[in-house]
Amino acid sequence: MGLLATIFGRRQAAAPPRRGVSRRLILRAGFDAAKTTDENRRHWAEADHLSADAAATPDVRRVLRARARYEAANNSYAKGIVATLANDCVGTGPRLQVLTDDADANAAIEAEFAAWAKAVDLPGKLRTMRMAKAVDGEAFALLTTNPEIASAVLLDLRLVEADQVTTPSLRLPSLASESAVDGIEFDDFGNPTFYHVLRAHPGSLFGLPTAEFDRVPASGMVHVFRVDRPGQSRGVPEITPALTLFAQLRRYTLAVLGAAETAADFAGILYTDAPAAGEADSIEPMDTVELESRALVTMPAGWKMGQVDAKQPSTTYGEFKREILNEIARCLNMPFNVAAGNSASYNYASGRLDHQTYFKAIRVERSEFECRVLDRILNEWLREASRALDLVPAALRDAMTVPHAWFWDGHEHVDPAKEATAQSTRLASHTTTLAAEYARMGLDWEDQIRQRAKE
């Protein structure tokens, strides 16, 4: 063994790592953002570990709603951004296309649904819901029966503000429940079962707010909001990250305007280069003299007239507004020129590129409305219509819904000639279909082909 060990060498047991070295290696493999230093301590002071619902308590959401509504009501940019978002998302409203094998039944259902949507002003209510989603954080619509509707189907949507969907008893620990989150009851699988709707708005002008509420089944309530975190039950305003920026924009504009007005208020100032008790005539300090237009003015001996150098608005004022508006619009996936209503600094290519991201966000938003709002409305409408009008084919009456698709307004191209050429190329190369091309414009290809045949 001694000879073999000498020839081949003897394996030596590896020495255990020193604790100090191992610890240094762990520290080197850490994350800089996880370290707390004297420099970043104040920046991360408000970071917490709260759940989505614990962070968005009723009081927090109430404050955010009030401030978001205040900015939307008093800030022209905020109002325009929210209104533009609703107009671009909903437009003139969605149009239904039924896809069963019965062409006559399809046409009848589509016509009746379009007439009902016009009778209840469905596009207008959807636009209001989209604005409420941006400003209030969520939108609610009760599926009710309205006997005054000029339609055989009496289904209607009654919009309810987020303030009115709450449970006053949740503020009492003895009545709180883990399966309930302010205004909503959930089952064991996380599905909403009931909504608590106050009988009077908390901010109503007609009497004092009441704590009485109705338990509305989830089947009769449409609730839409942007889910940013797992386990989130209620929505917060989509413009929340921009609220402080809106305030800064208005404060800066008022400060610039105030400085310019202050400088313009003084037509001129008398000053002298003579020393104190010098040869200049003595005049009353802080005295004011009204000047006449197009008149010659004589100065006291030794005195000169000068004007205040108006430095406001500064050359950086416009740049500041552009940067802050760009940051404001980013939380809504909206490009600067859409938020500002000004494309002066854009060229053709940059405008197209910015709008690609925006239009993709609009498609996602429309898909969410189809899934969470329109499909539920359609299913309820079909149930009512099958009883009132007998429109649904017998083979589909027991189904949960009918095959269908939704069409929305298309987006106008900046250069229609180029778009028409590209469309012809796609059709000639068989990389698209008439259905897809008409869908881009928000049109039903079958209706358009029939119309072309008539012409």
Region annotations inferred by a language model:
Residues M1-P94:
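N-terminal-proximal low-complexity accessory segments that begin disordered
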Residues R69-V227, R426:
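Structured, mid-chain assembly/scaffold modules that mediate subunit interfaces
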Residues L99-E110, V297-D415:
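Surface-exposed loop-to-helix/strand elements on domain peripheries
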Residues F113, L325, L434:
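Generic structural marker for isolated residues within well-ordered, non-membrane alpha-helices
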Residues T128-M129, T144, A259-A267, A339-S343, ...:
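Short coil/turn segments at secondary-structure boundaries
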Residues G190, I328, E437:
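Acidic/polar, glycine-anchored loop/turn motif associated with catalytic or activation segments
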Residues M221-L353, A395-R397:
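Extended, charged amphipathic alpha-helical segments
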Residues H413-E455:
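Charged substrate- and nucleic-acid-binding regions of tRNA-handling and nucleotidyl-transfer enzymes
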